[in-house]
């Protein structure tokens, strides 16, 4: 592969999306971008705080990482930034390795992601079974919810452990510091987020709920109708954040806020900082690097596929998307950011708000910059319990809880992989869950494929025994040739073996080795090994090894 020819294929979707771009499309993208930017701001702060970082780490990750992913990515509408899936991983890395090493592992993961896209390996991410993805997603959702109980309850806990069981112990030990004001704010936020969309649930023909529509007709209030429509488009997290922050400020409620814990949010871009790279450090961080890269790749490409389904726009380019994710994660750590990836909630909001191109993603970043510059001083009043309520809502929406109810209808393999990955994620960590889950998936796949290989004896005389082979003869199925070897060992001298292989679709090195051993056993007893109906792939394998010349074929 020559680098110049490959660079010719480096085509961000932004380049093709703006071809024939119109003013009408710009206004749609701008409106969608503003909406997504408003939604993204509280989420970015909440994800950073939940990860054990300062809120500005999430904000600048959303701005810088989001801009790079939109500008260079392979999806027209995907929105990038900090994601809930990374909360548990980042918190564990910071606790175990420290903040500086988080930045290094994120940058290294960016390099790995870029290389995956560069060598066109984006399709490999689809080989991760959906049962594993569902299991670790639900596990992460549980861990996010558990990690937010401290702030939801207003407990005075100096530092929360990343260990599942230790978190329960810490919460129990500090239960006496419960702050009822914080709990009330958090529960109000959570309840409001569930109720808000129900107030404006649209009716297909009218766009308003039947009850609201009747009320509008009764009072014939055009202005009220417009106000309701505008309210229905306002994101629930923003309504909860603004309302409850104002309530806390004016009533002077004694709860912990961003200001009391972090001292406020800087209004300037963080300075460029070069982490202390060394090969020894990089080697130490191999596991977190691979975890960040794998989760980022899976999360972003799943998100891009969802965007394709709901937007009706041309399909995303997975390799271009991975390269964009790589660039974003290589750059963001130098500004003190956290891992960035595609985010489903913000991407769906973008599509439903009318976004049609990466311009919407860039506008979402511009919106966040404007809001930060204008309103950063006000963020000091945001109660942490309200952010905890928002994250609990995110965790609820993140999980696929209905899958537990349908497990009895699923296959044993699906149940084993999903539940195994789920419990390993919760009890241990995502790295262990992914490693064990993928190994278990491979073992189950080999077992399933081995059952598809069949050996059937069709005839036997003192001179010749005939067998028909079906399926794929690979390392997981070679034991099924043992009955043929048993026949050879107990047969009279000079018996030949005929293998009808017209239904044998593939042959690997292990299968070839067993056939060679079988051939030697037959020849030692004065017989012949005959193949009838060899297909192209098995014939090619046998020919390259020289085995084909040693046997008879029909």
Regions found by a protein language model. Give the residues of each.
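Transmembrane helical cores of multi-pass ion-transport proteins
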Residues: 1-453, 514, 546
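Structured cytosolic domains appended to multi-pass membrane proteins
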Residues: 458-554
């Amino acid at each position: 592969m020559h680098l110049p020819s490959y660079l010719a294929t480096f085509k961000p979707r932004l380049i093709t999306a703006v071809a024939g771009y119109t003013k009408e499309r710009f206004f749609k993208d701008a409106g969608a971008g503003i909406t997504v930017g408003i939604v993204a701001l509280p989420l970015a702060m909440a994800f950073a705080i939940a990860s054990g970082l300062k809120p500005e780490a999430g904000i600048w990750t959303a701005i810088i990482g989001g801009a790079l992913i939109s500008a260079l990515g392979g999806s027209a509408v995907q929105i990038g930034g900090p994601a809930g899936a990374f909360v548990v991983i980042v918190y564990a890395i910071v606790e175990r390795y420290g903040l500086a090493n988080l930045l290094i592992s994120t940058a290294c993961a960016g390099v790995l992601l870029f290389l995956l896209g560069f060598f066109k390996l984006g399709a490999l991410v689809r080989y991760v079974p959906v049962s594993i993805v569902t299991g670790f997603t639900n596990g992460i959702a549980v861990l996010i919810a558990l990690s937010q109980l401290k702030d939801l309850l207003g407990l005075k806990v100096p530092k929360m452990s990343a260990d599942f069981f230790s978190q329960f112990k810490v919460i129990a030990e500090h239960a006496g510091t419960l702050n009822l004001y914080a709990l009330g704010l958090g529960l109000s936020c959570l309840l409001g987020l569930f109720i808000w969309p129900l107030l404006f649930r649209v009716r297909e023909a009218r766009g308003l709920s039947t009850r609201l529509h009747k009320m509008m007709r009764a009072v014939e209030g055009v202005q009220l109708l417009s106000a309701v429509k505008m309210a229905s488009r306002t994101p629930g997290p923003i309504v909860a954040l603004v309302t409850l922050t104002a309530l806390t400020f004016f009533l002077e409620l004694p709860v912990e806020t961003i200001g009391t814990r972090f001292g406020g949010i800087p209004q300037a871009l963080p300075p460029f900082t070069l982490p202390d790279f060394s090969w020894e450090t990089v080697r130490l961080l191999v596991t977190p690097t691979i975890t960040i890269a794998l989760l980022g790749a899976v999360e972003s490409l799943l998100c891009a596929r969802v965007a394709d389904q709901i937007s009706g726009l041309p399909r995303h380019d997975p390799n271009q998307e991975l390269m964009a994710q790589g660039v974003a994660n290589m750059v963001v750590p130098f500004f003190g950011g956290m891992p960035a990836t595609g985010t489903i909630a913000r991407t769906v909001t973008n599509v439903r708000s009318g976004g049609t191109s990466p311009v919407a993603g860039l506008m979402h970043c511009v919106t966040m910059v404007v809001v930060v510059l204008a309103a950063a001083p006000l963020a000091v009043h945001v109660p942490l319990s309200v952010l905890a309520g928002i994250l609990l809502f995110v965790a609820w929406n993140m999980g696929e809880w209905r899958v537990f109810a349908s497990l009895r209808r699923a296959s044993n393999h699906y149940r084993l992989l999903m539940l195994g990955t789920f419990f390993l994620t919760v009890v241990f960590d995502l790295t262990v869950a992914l490693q064990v889950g993928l190994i278990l998936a491979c073992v189950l796949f080999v077992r399933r494929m081995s059952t598809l290989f069949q050996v059937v004896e069709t005839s036997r005389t003192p001179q010749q025994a005939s067998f028909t082979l079906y399926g794929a003869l690979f390392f997981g199925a070679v034991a099924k040739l043992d009955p043929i070897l048993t026949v050879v060992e107990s047969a009279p001298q000079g018996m030949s073996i005929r293998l009808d292989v017209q239904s044998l679709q593939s042959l690997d090195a292990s299968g070839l080795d067993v056939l060679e051993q079988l051939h030697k056993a037959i020849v030692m007893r004065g017989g012949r090994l005959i193949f009838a109906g060899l297909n192209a792939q098995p014939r090619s394998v046998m020919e390259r090894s020289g085995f084909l010349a040693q046997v008879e074929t029909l």
